[in-house]
Amino acid sequence: RESGSMNGWLTEVKPPYDAKKLEEVKNFHITKAVETVTPKKCEIKPADEKEEFQIVLWDFGAKENIIRELTRRRCRVADLPAGTTAEEILAMNPDGIMLSNGPGNPEDNPEIIEEIRKITKAGKPMFGICLGHQLLAIAKGAKTGKMKFGHRGANQPVKDLTTGRVYISSQNHGYEVLRDTLPEGAEETFINVNDGTCEGITYHDMPAFTVQFHPEACAGPKDTEELFGRFIQMMRDY
């Protein structure tokens, strides 16, 4: 409780342990996490009913239910690898861009962050979840940090600062966007009720909003799934 989340080591070796090995465990850091979970090529997911919008899902390790939430709302989804460039995405002329969840430290993805920074200048509607929330924040000039204790589980309460309502959300992250570093034009819109950390941002200099939690959570909670409806309305208004 005093030291926060720490690395662990499962071993059959009996003590005393080698000091060098213990130091390696202590300093272990997962690298290139997104590369291990992103798709290798573009996959097209058709809308469930008559197509109304074409969406690019920038896939950093997306949960399948993100795609389901979009296709059931008449969206054709182009599921793209994390290494796709801003130029390639804009050439597809999507109605909106979805930044998915994914693993690891957001700051370990400088190339992706740079491509997101480029694409923000196009002014396309954007919706980010979890890692996508963090990556867009960094691209816009904010900073992230490792939490002493990450948020894990399907019972995390978040408060909508616009309405005052509290929702129960599903979360699985160990990094946070540091609210004191938010750039001009970025408004914190959700906070975690337990520890007060940033859980959502709306950008007033572009049509974009992001959340740290998972509104697409399957099998729930479903409290915030209507954020996908907000994204749809944003594209209609664009």
Where does each model-flagged region fall?
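Cysteine-nucleophile active-site neighborhood
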Residues: 96, 100-176, 220-235
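RNA-binding accessory domains that recognize and position tRNA/RNA substrates
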Residues: 1-93, 106-108, 218-220, 226, ...
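General small-molecule cofactor/ligand-binding pocket signal
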Residues: 78-80, 145, 189
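Flexible loop residues that form catalytic
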Residues: 102, 206, 216
